[in-house]
A protein has these predicted regions:
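N-terminal membrane-anchoring alpha-helices
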Residues: 2-94, 404, 422
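Membrane-embedded segments
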Residues: 110-156, 160-253
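Gly/Ala-rich beta-loop-alpha elbow adjacent to hydrolase catalytic centers
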Residues: 268-272, 276
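Hydrolase active-site cap/lid region
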Residues: 278-342, 348, 398-402
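Short beta-strand/loop motif that positions the catalytic acidic residue
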Residues: 345-347, 352-354, 358
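Conserved alpha/beta-hydrolase "acid-adjacent" motif
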Residues: 359-368
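C-terminal catalytic histidine-bearing segment of alpha/beta-hydrolase fold enzymes
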Residues: 367-370, 375-422
Length: 422
Protein backbone atom coordinates (compact mmCIF):
# COMPACT_ATOMS: atom_id res chain seq x y z
CA UNK A 1 0.00 0.00 0.00
CA UNK A 2 2.79 2.37 0.95
CA UNK A 3 4.65 1.43 -2.23
CA UNK A 4 1.58 2.28 -4.29
CA UNK A 5 1.25 5.64 -2.61
CA UNK A 6 4.91 6.39 -3.25
CA UNK A 7 4.54 5.40 -6.90
CA UNK A 8 1.49 7.67 -7.25
CA UNK A 9 3.32 10.56 -5.64
CA UNK A 10 6.36 10.03 -7.82
CA UNK A 11 4.16 9.95 -10.89
CA UNK A 12 2.42 13.18 -9.82
CA UNK A 13 5.76 14.85 -9.14
CA UNK A 14 7.11 13.74 -12.49
CA UNK A 15 3.98 15.05 -14.20
CA UNK A 16 4.30 18.40 -12.40
CA UNK A 17 7.96 18.68 -13.38
CA UNK A 18 7.06 17.89 -16.97
CA UNK A 19 4.32 20.50 -16.94
CA UNK A 20 6.71 23.07 -15.48
CA UNK A 21 9.29 22.26 -18.13
CA UNK A 22 6.69 22.65 -20.84
CA UNK A 23 5.55 25.96 -19.35
CA UNK A 24 9.12 27.26 -19.10
CA UNK A 25 9.80 26.12 -22.65
CA UNK A 26 6.66 27.90 -23.81
CA UNK A 27 7.72 31.07 -21.94
CA UNK A 28 11.15 30.92 -23.57
CA UNK A 29 9.64 30.47 -27.02
CA UNK A 30 7.14 33.28 -26.34
CA UNK A 31 9.90 35.56 -25.08
CA UNK A 32 12.02 34.80 -28.15
CA UNK A 33 9.03 35.43 -30.38
CA UNK A 34 8.26 38.76 -28.66
CA UNK A 35 11.92 39.80 -28.84
CA UNK A 36 12.13 38.82 -32.50
CA UNK A 37 8.90 40.65 -33.33
CA UNK A 38 10.07 43.71 -31.37
CA UNK A 39 13.39 43.67 -33.23
CA UNK A 40 11.63 43.37 -36.57
CA UNK A 41 9.26 46.25 -35.73
CA UNK A 42 12.17 48.37 -34.44
CA UNK A 43 14.18 47.72 -37.59
CA UNK A 44 11.15 48.48 -39.74
CA UNK A 45 10.47 51.74 -37.85
CA UNK A 46 14.15 52.67 -38.11
CA UNK A 47 14.19 51.97 -41.84
CA UNK A 48 10.99 53.97 -42.40
CA UNK A 49 12.02 56.96 -40.25
CA UNK A 50 15.71 57.18 -41.04
CA UNK A 51 15.96 55.76 -44.57
CA UNK A 52 12.60 55.75 -46.34
CA UNK A 53 11.44 59.22 -45.22
CA UNK A 54 14.76 60.92 -46.12
CA UNK A 55 14.67 59.20 -49.52
CA UNK A 56 11.08 60.37 -50.07
CA UNK A 57 12.22 63.89 -49.10
CA UNK A 58 15.15 63.65 -51.53
CA UNK A 59 12.94 62.87 -54.50
CA UNK A 60 9.87 64.98 -53.62
CA UNK A 61 10.19 68.65 -54.56
CA UNK A 62 6.67 69.24 -53.21
CA UNK A 63 7.63 67.87 -49.78
CA UNK A 64 10.81 69.96 -49.72
CA UNK A 65 8.81 73.13 -50.40
CA UNK A 66 6.17 72.15 -47.87
CA UNK A 67 8.70 71.65 -45.06
CA UNK A 68 10.65 74.81 -45.94
CA UNK A 69 7.76 77.25 -46.33
CA UNK A 70 5.27 75.63 -43.90
CA UNK A 71 2.31 77.29 -45.59
CA UNK A 72 0.00 74.66 -44.06
CA UNK A 73 0.60 76.10 -40.57
CA UNK A 74 -1.92 78.90 -40.09
CA UNK A 75 -2.68 80.98 -37.02
CA UNK A 76 -4.56 82.64 -35.48
CA UNK A 77 -7.52 80.49 -36.62
CA UNK A 78 -10.37 81.95 -38.68
CA UNK A 79 -8.55 85.25 -39.20
CA UNK A 80 -10.22 87.53 -41.75
CA UNK A 81 -7.22 89.11 -43.48
CA UNK A 82 -9.49 91.35 -45.53
CA UNK A 83 -10.32 93.20 -42.30
CA UNK A 84 -7.05 94.23 -40.62
CA UNK A 85 -9.01 96.08 -37.92
CA UNK A 86 -9.90 92.65 -36.51
CA UNK A 87 -6.18 92.18 -35.88
CA UNK A 88 -6.04 95.46 -33.98
CA UNK A 89 -4.84 97.62 -36.87
CA UNK A 90 -6.92 100.73 -37.49
CA UNK A 91 -6.29 102.98 -40.50
CA UNK A 92 -4.96 100.02 -42.48
CA UNK A 93 -5.78 99.12 -46.05
CA UNK A 94 -6.02 95.58 -47.41
CA UNK A 95 -5.07 95.41 -51.09
CA UNK A 96 -3.79 93.05 -53.75
CA UNK A 97 -0.84 93.69 -56.04
CA UNK A 98 -1.23 91.66 -59.23
CA UNK A 99 1.65 91.04 -61.61
CA UNK A 100 2.61 88.66 -64.38
CA UNK A 101 5.21 86.02 -63.51
CA UNK A 102 6.82 85.71 -66.91
CA UNK A 103 8.88 82.62 -66.14
CA UNK A 104 5.92 80.59 -64.87
CA UNK A 105 3.50 82.34 -67.26
CA UNK A 106 0.89 83.02 -64.57
CA UNK A 107 -0.76 86.02 -62.93
CA UNK A 108 0.05 86.31 -59.23
CA UNK A 109 -2.07 88.14 -56.65
CA UNK A 110 0.00 89.28 -53.67
CA UNK A 111 -2.05 90.22 -50.60
CA UNK A 112 -0.81 93.34 -48.80
CA UNK A 113 -1.55 95.49 -45.77
CA UNK A 114 -0.66 99.19 -45.80
CA UNK A 115 -0.51 100.53 -42.23
CA UNK A 116 -0.57 104.33 -41.90
CA UNK A 117 1.95 106.07 -39.61
CA UNK A 118 0.75 107.36 -36.25
CA UNK A 119 1.22 111.06 -36.95
CA UNK A 120 -1.07 110.83 -39.97
CA UNK A 121 -3.69 108.87 -38.06
CA UNK A 122 -3.67 111.35 -35.18
CA UNK A 123 -3.90 114.30 -37.57
CA UNK A 124 -6.89 112.87 -39.45
CA UNK A 125 -8.34 110.66 -36.72
CA UNK A 126 -11.82 112.16 -36.95
CA UNK A 127 -12.00 111.86 -40.73
CA UNK A 128 -10.64 108.30 -40.56
CA UNK A 129 -13.32 107.52 -37.97
CA UNK A 130 -10.85 106.45 -35.28
CA UNK A 131 -12.25 106.56 -31.74
CA UNK A 132 -10.62 108.73 -29.06
CA UNK A 133 -9.51 105.79 -26.91
CA UNK A 134 -7.52 104.35 -29.81
CA UNK A 135 -6.01 107.72 -30.72
CA UNK A 136 -4.91 108.36 -27.14
CA UNK A 137 -2.86 105.15 -27.19
CA UNK A 138 -1.11 105.95 -30.47
CA UNK A 139 2.08 107.48 -29.11
CA UNK A 140 5.73 106.84 -29.81
CA UNK A 141 7.98 105.27 -27.16
CA UNK A 142 9.09 108.02 -24.79
CA UNK A 143 12.82 107.54 -25.43
CA UNK A 144 12.50 108.45 -29.11
CA UNK A 145 9.41 110.67 -29.08
CA UNK A 146 11.30 113.87 -29.91
CA UNK A 147 13.18 112.25 -32.80
CA UNK A 148 10.04 110.61 -34.14
CA UNK A 149 8.02 113.82 -34.03
CA UNK A 150 10.64 115.43 -36.26
CA UNK A 151 9.87 112.82 -38.91
CA UNK A 152 6.26 113.97 -39.09
CA UNK A 153 5.21 116.25 -41.93
CA UNK A 154 4.59 119.76 -40.61
CA UNK A 155 3.82 121.47 -43.92
CA UNK A 156 0.01 121.58 -44.04
CA UNK A 157 0.03 122.41 -47.75
CA UNK A 158 1.26 118.86 -48.42
CA UNK A 159 -2.08 117.51 -47.23
CA UNK A 160 -4.28 119.40 -49.71
CA UNK A 161 -5.28 116.37 -51.79
CA UNK A 162 -5.72 114.22 -48.70
CA UNK A 163 -8.04 116.76 -47.14
CA UNK A 164 -10.07 117.02 -50.32
CA UNK A 165 -10.58 113.25 -50.30
CA UNK A 166 -11.39 113.07 -46.58
CA UNK A 167 -13.78 116.03 -46.61
CA UNK A 168 -16.04 114.74 -49.36
CA UNK A 169 -19.68 114.79 -48.34
CA UNK A 170 -20.24 111.27 -49.67
CA UNK A 171 -17.01 109.80 -48.25
CA UNK A 172 -17.21 106.02 -47.81
CA UNK A 173 -14.05 104.60 -46.26
CA UNK A 174 -15.25 101.05 -46.89
CA UNK A 175 -15.28 101.64 -50.65
CA UNK A 176 -12.24 100.03 -52.30
CA UNK A 177 -11.78 102.80 -54.88
CA UNK A 178 -11.85 105.44 -52.14
CA UNK A 179 -9.37 103.46 -50.05
CA UNK A 180 -7.03 103.12 -53.01
CA UNK A 181 -7.16 106.85 -53.76
CA UNK A 182 -6.73 107.81 -50.10
CA UNK A 183 -3.92 105.46 -49.11
CA UNK A 184 -1.91 105.98 -52.28
CA UNK A 185 -2.20 109.73 -51.75
CA UNK A 186 -0.71 109.28 -48.26
CA UNK A 187 2.33 107.70 -49.89
CA UNK A 188 2.62 110.59 -52.36
CA UNK A 189 1.83 113.52 -50.09
CA UNK A 190 3.72 112.73 -46.90
CA UNK A 191 7.44 112.62 -46.23
CA UNK A 192 7.17 109.61 -43.92
CA UNK A 193 9.59 106.81 -44.72
CA UNK A 194 8.27 103.38 -45.72
CA UNK A 195 9.13 99.96 -44.29
CA UNK A 196 8.46 96.93 -46.48
CA UNK A 197 8.12 93.94 -44.15
CA UNK A 198 9.01 90.44 -45.37
CA UNK A 199 7.85 87.76 -42.96
CA UNK A 200 9.24 84.29 -42.28
CA UNK A 201 7.56 80.94 -42.86
CA UNK A 202 4.26 79.79 -41.30
CA UNK A 203 1.02 81.76 -40.83
CA UNK A 204 0.42 85.09 -42.60
CA UNK A 205 0.89 88.85 -42.35
CA UNK A 206 -1.78 88.73 -39.61
CA UNK A 207 0.23 86.68 -37.09
CA UNK A 208 0.18 88.41 -33.71
CA UNK A 209 3.96 88.85 -33.33
CA UNK A 210 4.07 90.50 -36.76
CA UNK A 211 1.20 92.83 -35.92
CA UNK A 212 3.10 93.77 -32.77
CA UNK A 213 6.04 94.92 -34.90
CA UNK A 214 3.78 96.85 -37.31
CA UNK A 215 2.36 98.77 -34.36
CA UNK A 216 5.85 99.63 -33.15
CA UNK A 217 6.99 100.82 -36.58
CA UNK A 218 3.84 102.90 -37.15
CA UNK A 219 4.39 104.49 -33.71
CA UNK A 220 7.78 105.63 -35.05
CA UNK A 221 5.89 107.39 -37.87
CA UNK A 222 6.76 104.96 -40.65
CA UNK A 223 4.37 103.64 -43.27
CA UNK A 224 4.36 99.85 -42.95
CA UNK A 225 3.69 97.68 -45.99
CA UNK A 226 3.43 93.96 -45.19
CA UNK A 227 2.82 91.24 -47.75
CA UNK A 228 2.00 87.55 -47.92
CA UNK A 229 3.96 85.64 -50.53
CA UNK A 230 2.21 83.21 -52.87
CA UNK A 231 0.80 80.28 -50.94
CA UNK A 232 0.41 82.30 -47.72
CA UNK A 233 -2.70 83.95 -46.31
CA UNK A 234 -5.07 85.11 -49.04
CA UNK A 235 -2.39 85.57 -51.69
CA UNK A 236 -2.46 83.44 -54.85
CA UNK A 237 -2.86 79.75 -54.08
CA UNK A 238 0.40 78.83 -55.78
CA UNK A 239 3.11 76.63 -54.31
CA UNK A 240 6.00 78.92 -53.29
CA UNK A 241 9.60 78.67 -54.46
CA UNK A 242 12.58 80.82 -53.56
CA UNK A 243 12.44 82.60 -56.89
CA UNK A 244 8.67 83.00 -56.61
CA UNK A 245 8.61 84.65 -53.18
CA UNK A 246 11.47 86.98 -54.15
CA UNK A 247 9.56 88.13 -57.23
CA UNK A 248 6.42 88.61 -55.12
CA UNK A 249 8.44 90.93 -52.88
CA UNK A 250 9.84 92.69 -55.95
CA UNK A 251 6.31 93.33 -57.27
CA UNK A 252 5.26 95.00 -54.01
CA UNK A 253 8.50 96.99 -53.82
CA UNK A 254 7.90 98.29 -57.35
CA UNK A 255 4.29 99.10 -56.46
CA UNK A 256 5.56 101.30 -53.59
CA UNK A 257 8.26 103.03 -55.62
CA UNK A 258 5.87 103.69 -58.50
CA UNK A 259 3.81 105.87 -56.13
CA UNK A 260 6.23 107.37 -53.62
CA UNK A 261 9.68 108.94 -53.84
CA UNK A 262 10.19 108.63 -50.08
CA UNK A 263 12.94 106.40 -48.67
CA UNK A 264 12.05 102.71 -48.46
CA UNK A 265 13.65 100.21 -46.09
CA UNK A 266 13.40 96.43 -46.16
CA UNK A 267 12.75 94.52 -42.95
CA UNK A 268 13.12 90.76 -43.18
CA UNK A 269 12.48 88.30 -40.38
CA UNK A 270 13.74 84.70 -40.29
CA UNK A 271 13.13 83.21 -43.77
CA UNK A 272 12.26 86.77 -44.83
CA UNK A 273 15.91 87.75 -44.30
CA UNK A 274 16.78 85.34 -47.11
CA UNK A 275 14.08 86.93 -49.26
CA UNK A 276 15.41 90.42 -48.44
CA UNK A 277 19.05 89.74 -49.32
CA UNK A 278 18.06 87.91 -52.51
CA UNK A 279 15.76 90.80 -53.49
CA UNK A 280 18.54 93.34 -52.95
CA UNK A 281 20.89 91.24 -55.06
CA UNK A 282 18.23 91.01 -57.78
CA UNK A 283 17.64 94.78 -57.78
CA UNK A 284 21.38 95.29 -58.20
CA UNK A 285 21.51 92.82 -61.11
CA UNK A 286 18.55 94.58 -62.74
CA UNK A 287 20.19 98.01 -62.22
CA UNK A 288 17.05 99.21 -60.42
CA UNK A 289 17.10 101.76 -57.58
CA UNK A 290 17.22 99.86 -54.30
CA UNK A 291 15.96 100.67 -50.81
CA UNK A 292 18.01 102.89 -48.53
CA UNK A 293 18.89 100.09 -46.08
CA UNK A 294 17.82 96.67 -44.82
CA UNK A 295 17.07 95.22 -41.39
CA UNK A 296 17.69 91.49 -40.94
CA UNK A 297 15.93 90.16 -37.84
CA UNK A 298 16.97 86.63 -36.77
CA UNK A 299 18.98 86.03 -39.97
CA UNK A 300 20.77 82.86 -41.10
CA UNK A 301 23.64 82.47 -43.54
CA UNK A 302 22.18 79.83 -45.88
CA UNK A 303 19.43 77.24 -45.87
CA UNK A 304 21.84 74.29 -45.73
CA UNK A 305 23.17 75.28 -42.32
CA UNK A 306 19.78 76.50 -41.10
CA UNK A 307 17.95 73.23 -41.79
CA UNK A 308 20.75 71.36 -40.05
CA UNK A 309 20.30 73.56 -36.96
CA UNK A 310 16.49 73.73 -37.04
CA UNK A 311 14.52 71.79 -34.37
CA UNK A 312 12.71 69.87 -37.14
CA UNK A 313 15.98 68.19 -38.15
CA UNK A 314 17.00 67.07 -34.66
CA UNK A 315 16.34 63.38 -35.44
CA UNK A 316 18.19 63.47 -38.74
CA UNK A 317 21.08 65.91 -38.60
CA UNK A 318 23.65 63.33 -37.42
CA UNK A 319 22.83 60.77 -40.10
CA UNK A 320 25.72 60.13 -42.53
CA UNK A 321 23.30 60.56 -45.43
CA UNK A 322 21.69 63.78 -44.15
CA UNK A 323 23.46 65.99 -46.68
CA UNK A 324 22.77 63.53 -49.52
CA UNK A 325 19.03 63.18 -48.82
CA UNK A 326 18.13 66.57 -47.30
CA UNK A 327 20.52 69.44 -48.03
CA UNK A 328 21.78 68.70 -51.52
CA UNK A 329 18.35 67.95 -53.04
CA UNK A 330 17.04 71.32 -51.79
CA UNK A 331 20.02 73.08 -53.34
CA UNK A 332 19.50 71.19 -56.58
CA UNK A 333 15.90 72.48 -56.61
CA UNK A 334 17.00 76.11 -56.08
CA UNK A 335 15.85 76.27 -52.45
CA UNK A 336 18.98 77.92 -51.10
CA UNK A 337 18.40 81.37 -49.58
CA UNK A 338 22.14 82.02 -49.65
CA UNK A 339 22.33 85.26 -47.70
CA UNK A 340 26.07 84.70 -47.22
CA UNK A 341 26.40 85.02 -51.01
CA UNK A 342 23.81 87.73 -51.63
CA UNK A 343 25.05 90.04 -48.88
CA UNK A 344 28.22 90.56 -50.92
CA UNK A 345 26.18 91.57 -53.99
CA UNK A 346 24.50 94.79 -52.83
CA UNK A 347 25.84 97.98 -51.26
CA UNK A 348 23.07 99.09 -48.88
CA UNK A 349 23.71 99.37 -45.11
CA UNK A 350 22.60 96.35 -43.09
CA UNK A 351 21.28 96.21 -39.53
CA UNK A 352 21.21 92.71 -37.98
CA UNK A 353 19.17 91.89 -34.88
CA UNK A 354 19.46 88.53 -33.12
CA UNK A 355 18.45 87.13 -29.73
CA UNK A 356 20.83 84.76 -27.97
CA UNK A 357 17.93 82.48 -26.98
CA UNK A 358 16.63 82.03 -30.53
CA UNK A 359 16.07 78.27 -30.87
CA UNK A 360 14.66 78.39 -34.42
CA UNK A 361 17.50 80.27 -36.09
CA UNK A 362 20.49 79.89 -33.76
CA UNK A 363 22.34 83.04 -32.78
CA UNK A 364 25.55 81.51 -34.15
CA UNK A 365 24.19 81.53 -37.73
CA UNK A 366 23.27 85.22 -37.56
CA UNK A 367 26.70 86.09 -36.20
CA UNK A 368 28.34 83.93 -38.87
CA UNK A 369 26.49 85.92 -41.54
CA UNK A 370 27.72 89.14 -39.91
CA UNK A 371 31.35 87.94 -39.99
CA UNK A 372 30.95 86.87 -43.62
CA UNK A 373 29.57 90.30 -44.52
CA UNK A 374 32.53 92.03 -42.88
CA UNK A 375 34.93 89.88 -44.90
CA UNK A 376 33.23 90.01 -48.31
CA UNK A 377 31.61 93.43 -48.72
CA UNK A 378 33.36 96.39 -50.31
CA UNK A 379 35.05 98.83 -47.96
CA UNK A 380 33.16 101.78 -49.45
CA UNK A 381 29.78 100.06 -49.16
CA UNK A 382 27.14 100.69 -46.52
CA UNK A 383 28.19 99.62 -43.01
CA UNK A 384 27.06 96.46 -41.23
CA UNK A 385 25.68 96.67 -37.69
CA UNK A 386 24.98 93.71 -35.43
CA UNK A 387 22.88 93.96 -32.26
CA UNK A 388 22.82 91.10 -29.79
CA UNK A 389 19.89 90.69 -27.39
CA UNK A 390 20.74 88.86 -24.16
CA UNK A 391 19.07 85.50 -23.53
CA UNK A 392 17.95 86.74 -20.12
CA UNK A 393 15.45 88.99 -21.94
CA UNK A 394 13.66 85.92 -23.38
CA UNK A 395 12.85 87.49 -26.76
CA UNK A 396 13.50 84.22 -28.57
CA UNK A 397 12.77 84.02 -32.27
CA UNK A 398 9.75 86.31 -32.47
CA UNK A 399 9.78 89.05 -29.88
CA UNK A 400 12.79 91.31 -30.41
CA UNK A 401 10.08 93.91 -31.12
CA UNK A 402 9.57 94.06 -27.33
CA UNK A 403 13.12 95.19 -26.60
CA UNK A 404 13.00 98.64 -24.93
CA UNK A 405 16.07 99.81 -26.87
CA UNK A 406 14.82 98.67 -30.29
CA UNK A 407 13.06 101.97 -31.20
CA UNK A 408 16.26 103.91 -30.54
CA UNK A 409 18.30 101.45 -32.62
CA UNK A 410 15.87 101.55 -35.55
CA UNK A 411 15.30 105.32 -35.61
CA UNK A 412 19.03 106.06 -35.38
CA UNK A 413 19.86 103.54 -38.14
CA UNK A 414 17.17 104.78 -40.54
CA UNK A 415 17.95 108.45 -39.91
CA UNK A 416 21.67 107.87 -40.45
CA UNK A 417 21.21 106.40 -43.92
CA UNK A 418 17.98 108.09 -44.98
CA UNK A 419 19.67 110.43 -47.43
CA UNK A 420 22.56 108.15 -48.41
CA UNK A 421 22.81 106.45 -51.78
CA UNK A 422 25.06 103.41 -52.13
Amino acid sequence: MRRAVIIVKATSLSSAVGTLRMYLSFRRRLFKRICLTTCKISILVFVIIFIVLPLIFKFSFALQKSILFLTFITYPPNLDLKKPEKSGLCATRNLYVTYRDQEEDIDVDVAVWHVLPNDLVRRFGKELQIDEATLSNMTAPEDVRDKVDKLAENDSSKYGNLERILHRSNLNLADEATQKELFEETLRATTNDIVLYLHGNTASRGASHRVELYKLLRSLNYHVVALDYRGYGDSADISPTERGVVYDALAVYQYITSISKNPVYLWGHSLGTGVATHLLSLLTDMSLPGPRAVVLESPFNNIREEICAHPFSKLYRHLPWFDYTISRPMYANELRFESDQHIAEFRQPVLMLHAEDDHVVPFSLGYKLYRTALDTRGKSWGPIEFHRFEKTSHYGHRYICRAPNLPEIVVRFFRTYRDEQY
